[in-house]
Amino acid sequence: ADNPGDDGN
């Protein structure tokens, strides 16, 4: 699962 702080920008 992706971390909640990971915005992908």
From Swiss-Prot:
Thermal dependence of catalysis: Optimum temperature is 70 degrees Celsius.
Name of the molecule in the record: Peroxidase
Enzyme class name: oxidoreductase
Biological source species: Pleurotus pulmonarius (Indian oyster mushroom)
Keyword vocabulary terms for this entry: Oxidoreductase, Peroxidase
Entry GO MF terms: lactoperoxidase activity; peroxidase activity
E.C. designation(s): 1.11.1.7
Reactions catalysed: 2 a phenolic donor + H2O2 = 2 a phenolic radical donor + 2 H2O
